[in-house]
């Protein structure tokens, strides 16, 4: 019998070991090993046992056979990687800059096997007459617990063991005594854990609008004809994108296919899951970070076994091992949380398209405010674009009031609530309607502005706001430009130059001062630390247990509250002035989403946008819910500045404990890239936005080019340089088309 060999990636994340090592497959494991399997192998001079993953199997020996070590065995509890996921891991490694073991662990949704839940039941063996006779005997002997159990058995043939020991209060010894006399027997069975806590309701199939029907018909026509592509649905808030997703999923299930529904935040899971569960029942499940290891493992096993058709979750749900995936839906595709912030820094949108290729599936992106990347690609014909232009309720979009905070200050109002917002809140409270107050803190990085005229201190070289640092200096986190904090506004001469520091707690306190007795709920990082906190807050507000919901960006994403008729956006300028080229896009997206929360029921809605820059195109376009005008302005800025999507961008971040060593390596690497690729545009190096975390210093430089593959070559150049130099106690991270300033 010919000898078989396995190429193995070892479970050590180090650049020197980022390659395959060949091992001989012992006879006893020949029939148990396949690509993706987790194995134990002797490694290094000391032959210490470590884990590894098999990526290929063959009969060609790369070295002298006597030098090839043998696989030691299979570890307990470790899960393997699905065959298609190995190819995906290789793609992630190449395109995002990481080791193969990091990529393999990324595509493993459940890391360990876990025993199934054991269910024990007591099953009656005696007929009812015999049982009643035994019951009478126990009552005469005053065997109270035994009699209680026999009475229950006489009324039902099967009783769950948990109910016996819990509700009936009967001990295990008493149960065993009944089993011993032949009155009943204990039966054990195993089942998968199901993390879905919602109750199935009435199945509803809404009447489709002509726009919705067109999308469904054309997507399915393409699919049935064997055409595979990515679709972008640009639908205003309340236009019925979710119904389109559900109809498409239903059609995929009829065709024997499964679907993955990606959502941007854990906070969306409860409401989204409820809608899907009401439609598809227990064939729906969820995959997210709040699940226990047992729950994660069981959802993967249920998916592989064909027990579920739909999985819902954030970007990690993308790696669910369905056997015949047909559709990936990416709702709110513009959201930053679709980009991983840890290595590998993959984007779910690009990765979903690669997964779809492997399964011959399709991708449907949906948003009221598509990312510039998605809309840009649709414009170039890479995606097929559909529009949903009408609200399903038939209602109008909310009336929007833009309040100039400079004018409020001039007229003596120093409150965080403008007079218009106070007037409308008073009206809603008197009518028993609900209000959402949104603090736009996303991307806040210590920007400084003039409270009198609204002027923001900006970098003269990068057209992003400068960030305030200790020592009274302002710094640009792209090119490193720095200047002292001015004492007077350079535009109007005012001395009112400062940053915005209000948080949700202060807003809640001020609201209660203004309206004693008002019922409030807060949704922010502090109030959503526990596993079920999102669901509890959303459910309480939906049930009318509060008049006002106060929160950050998580409260404006996709939630439907029919009684909300007013949305107040307290500080639109916070995200607008983040030191980030995407600041305008993020502001427009958040404001549009926030405004869209009002008037989603039968009652009309209103929104108030408070800002120091009422004429900025991100503000005016959001107030008008005019995406096209915003896109035309913003894409012009990106093209002129050479930012994504008009070009691609790579951030190379250098870490280390000694700042001088980090700075020197950043400079040397920048020089190497410049000398090898002098056609590139390079920014930096400069200290990172947060220049030190846990005593680790961070520097960054950026490379820009029209072709993504050119930046992959930059990554390869940096990696090869590091292999030659072998710097000690320093590490590198790559971030392609970063969504946040590093």
Predicted regions and their residues:
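Inter-lobe coupling/hinge segments of SF2-like helicase ATPases
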Residues: 203-209, 213, 217, 227-663, ...
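Short coil/turn motifs at beta-sheet boundaries
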Residues: 1, 16, 34, 82, ...
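A carboxyl-terminal module marker
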Residues: 671-694, 719, 732, 736-739
């Amino acid at each position: 019998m010919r000898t078989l060999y396995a190429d193995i990636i070892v479970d050590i994340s180090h650049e020197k070991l980022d390659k395959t090592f060949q091992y001989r497959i012992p006879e006893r494991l020949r029939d148990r090993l396949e690509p993706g399997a987790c194995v134990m192998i002797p490694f290094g001079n000391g032959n210490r046992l470590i884990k590894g993953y098999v990526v290929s199997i063959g009969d060609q020996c790369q070295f002298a056979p006597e030098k090839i070590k043998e696989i030691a065995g299979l570890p307990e509890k470790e899960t393997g990687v699905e065959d298609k996921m190995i190819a995906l891991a290789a793609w992630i490694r190449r395109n995002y800059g990481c080791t193969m073991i990091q990529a393999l662990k990324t595509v493993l949704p459940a890391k360990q096997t876990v025993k199934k839940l054991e269910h024990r039941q007591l099953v009656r063996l005696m007929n009812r007459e015999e049982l009643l006779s035994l019951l009478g005997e126990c009552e005469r002997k005053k065997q109270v617990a035994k009699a209680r159990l026999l009475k229950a058995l006489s009324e039902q043939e099967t009783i769950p063991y948990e109910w016996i020991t819990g509700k009936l209060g009967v001990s295990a010894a008493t149960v065993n005594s009944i089993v011993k006399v032949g009155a009943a027997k204990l039966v054990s069975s195993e089942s998968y854990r199901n993390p879905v806590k919602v109750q199935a309701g009435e199945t509803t199939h809404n009447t489709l609008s002509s726009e919705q029907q067109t999308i469904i018909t054309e997507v399915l026509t393409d699919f049935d004809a064997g055409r595979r592509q990515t679709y972008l649905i640009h639908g205003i808030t309340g236009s019925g994108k979710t119904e389109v997703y559900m109809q498409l999923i239903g059609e995929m299930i009829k065709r024997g296919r499964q679907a993955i529904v990606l959502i941007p935040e854990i906070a969306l899971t409860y409401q989204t899951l409820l809608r899907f569960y009401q439609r598809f029942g227990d064939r729906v499940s969820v995959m997210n970070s709040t699940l226990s290891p047992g729950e994660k493992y069981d959802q993967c096993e249920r998916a592989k076994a064909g027990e579920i058709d739909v999985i819902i979750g954030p970007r990690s749900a993308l790696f669910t091992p369905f056997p015949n995936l047909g559709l990936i839906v990416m709702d709110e595709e513009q959201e930053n949380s679709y980009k991983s912030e840890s290595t590998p820094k993959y984007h779910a949108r690009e990765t979903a398209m690669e997964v779809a290729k492997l399964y011959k599936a399709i991708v449907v992106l949906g948003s009221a405010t598509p990312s510039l990347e998605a809309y840009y690609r649709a414009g170039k014909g890479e995606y097929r674009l559909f529009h949903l232009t009408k609200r399903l309720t038939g209602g109008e979009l909310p009336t929007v009031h833009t309040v100039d905070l400079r004018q409020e200050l001039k007229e003596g109002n120093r409150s965080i609530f403008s007079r218009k917002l106070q007037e409308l809140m008073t009206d809603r409270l008197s009518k028993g309607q609900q209000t959402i107050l949104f603090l736009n803190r996303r991307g806040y990085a210590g920007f400084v502005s003039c409270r009198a005229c609204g002027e923001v201190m900006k970098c003269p070289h990068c057209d992003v706001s400068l960030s305030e640092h200790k020592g009274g200096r302002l710094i640009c986190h792209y090119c490193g430009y720095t200047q002292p904090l001015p004492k007077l506004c350079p535009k109007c001469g005012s001395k009112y130059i400062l940053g915005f520091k209000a948080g949700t707690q202060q807003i809640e306190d001020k609201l209660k001062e203004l309206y004693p007795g008002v019922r409030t709920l807060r949704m922010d990082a502090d109030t959503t630390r526990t596993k079920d906190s999102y669901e509890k807050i959303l459910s309480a507000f939906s049930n009318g247990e509060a008049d006002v919901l106060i929160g950050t960006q998580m409260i404006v994403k996709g939630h439907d509250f029919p009684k909300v008729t007013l949305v107040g956006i307290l500080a639109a300028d916070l995200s607008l002035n983040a030191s980030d080229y995407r600041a305008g896009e993020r502001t427009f997206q958040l404001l549009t989403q926030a405004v869209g929360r009002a008037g989603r029921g039968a009652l009309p809605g209103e929104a108030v946008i408070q800002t120091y820059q009422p004429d900025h195109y991100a503000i005016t376009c959001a107030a008008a819910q005019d995406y096209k005008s915003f896109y035309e302005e913003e894409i012009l800025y990106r093209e002129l500045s050479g930012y994504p999507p008009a070009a691609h961008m790579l951030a190379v971040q250098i870490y280390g404990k000694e700042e001088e060593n980090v700075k020197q390596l950043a400079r040397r690497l920048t020089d190497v890239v410049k000398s090898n690729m002098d056609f590139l545009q390079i920014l930096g190096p400069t200290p990172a936005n947060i220049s030190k975390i846990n005593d680790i210093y961070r520097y960054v430089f950026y490379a820009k080019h029209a072709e993504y593959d050119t930046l992959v070559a930059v990554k390869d150049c940096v990696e090869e340089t590091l292999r030659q130099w072998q710097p000690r106690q320093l590490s590198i991270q790559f971030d392609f088309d970063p969504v946040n300033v590093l």
